């Protein structure tokens, strides 16, 4: 994840005291397949889907970007335009941590990702899994595809968004 960039650089021998001057932003991304807009199929969310998505959406920053309907997601079907796959193209699920005074101070004293995420709380960062969950509800990708690429049950991630 993006906060893990700082401990990894320190582990590689970069001096923690210069990270603040050397970095402006840390970003992590995973590419997910984009649902084919010609053949995707709407389906209601089940209790199992809610069990996965609800913790991600509970405290999500920028709620205004969520679709009005939070009870529907989309599945791949397959057609001539997508070669029968149900997917056509890719899109990134991202998370970005800006280097600011709080992050710089945190990195100088600890290399704990939990502490870095706590220091970044004021930035209202949408975690990669949360960005993907929004894309699932918008019909951009499927929950199956998102869970293939992003760990939706990551303990640190779930703890830091709670």
Segments from the language model and where they lie:
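Short, flexible helix-loop junctions that flank or precede catalytic/ligand sites
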Residues: 1-162
